[in-house]
């Protein structure tokens, strides 16, 4: 399920859409990831190892590795403390897998699923972004106002960024790993942190719109992404069912707003930067801000998902992959 364990947003499994042909529905890949009662569990994250030709799906209880050619589950591993939204190293070998809002992350071997190291000392582990250099991992603890940075050579925390105005929720980083764009509890807006010094640089509030109750996640702006060219920041607004667009260059001018059909709680982009994928199920043209279509499954049911990733194939194998997070890609 793309949102919690609700089957009304596209059902169970991995849904495949053809980006080159109008995002038409292609197929549904069968997955595991079940609650103890046998019903589909909440999907917490999705990530790809191009090197291993595998896609990984985390649920509340487990992590699955699925071969992208055979579309078969290679293994499913249960983890003590559960699983949350993970991230994989650029070489496709190592994963940082948060526990389910417990006090630790597991560093996991992507080939075997074995735990390499446990990193503890947190309150509620949740979101994870592996930096483009492969040297740092950015870790969001939703019980702390800090964004944590781990050194991947030692798997030890080497920096805290913040403190921010509230507990850190979804965030993103630029390609050069100098800036972090962070959403926090209670703020309809985002904050900016310096990933080298650890200092908070800016706090931005959405102008012209009021906060209100949201059905999921509890914070007003659950979802933020950088366009791949790093020119813009797209911010989710659940209550007002909007995407707010900002310049990604200080002073981060608010540019426009785009209405959605449901409460967006996540956003990512295509690798080429042409398409935005909010979790409410629309495909948005980044340049024109127009909603091009709404994703539908094989039964013509509306599809919504907070776990979306682009994969490019050649001769049946993955050659390039995007990210569930809308991370910067400007080199």
Language model region names:
Residues 1-331:
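Predominantly soluble domains enriched in secretory-pathway, periplasmic, or organellar proteins
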């Amino acid at each position: 399920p793309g949102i919690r364990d609700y089957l009304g947003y596209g059902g169970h499994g991995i849904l495949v859409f053809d980006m080159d042909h109008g995002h038409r529905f292609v197929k549904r890949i069968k997955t595991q990831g079940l609650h103890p009662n046998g019903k589909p569990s909440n999907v917490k994250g999705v990530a790809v190892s191009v090197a291993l030709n595998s896609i990984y799906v985390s649920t509340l209880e487990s992590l699955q590795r699925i071969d992208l050619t055979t579309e078969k589950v290679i293994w499913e591993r249960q983890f003590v403390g559960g699983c949350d939204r993970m991230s994989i190293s650029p070489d496709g070998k190592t994963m940082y897998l948060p526990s389910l809002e417990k006090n630790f992350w597991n560093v996991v071997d992507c080939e075997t699923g074995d735990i390499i190291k446990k990193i503890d000392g947190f309150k509620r582990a949740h979101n994870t972004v592996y930096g483009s250099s492969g040297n740092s991992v950015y870790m969001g603890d939703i019980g702390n106002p800090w964004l944590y940075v781990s050194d991947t050579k030692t798997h030890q925390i080497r920096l805290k960024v913040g403190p921010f105005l509230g507990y850190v929720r979804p965030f993103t980083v630029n390609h050069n790993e100098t800036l972090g764009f962070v959403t926090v509890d209670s703020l309809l807006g985002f904050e900016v942190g310096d990933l080298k010094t650890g200092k908070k640089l800016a706090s931005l509030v959405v102008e012209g719109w009021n906060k209100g109750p949201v059905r999921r996640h509890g914070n007003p702006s659950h979802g933020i992404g950088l366009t791949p060219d790093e020119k813009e920041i797209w911010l989710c607004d659940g209550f007002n069912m909007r995407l707010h667009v900002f310049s990604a260059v200080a002073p981060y001018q608010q540019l426009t707003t785009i209405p959605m059909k449901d409460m967006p709680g996540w956003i990512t982009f295509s690798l080429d930067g042409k398409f935005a994928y909010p979790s409410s199920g629309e495909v948005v043209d980044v340049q024109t801000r127009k909603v091009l279509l709404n994703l539908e499954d094989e039964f013509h049911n509306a599809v919504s998902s907070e776990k979306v990733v682009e994969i490019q194939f050649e001769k049946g194998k993955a050659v390039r992959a995007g990210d569930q997070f809308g991370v910067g890609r400007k080199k």
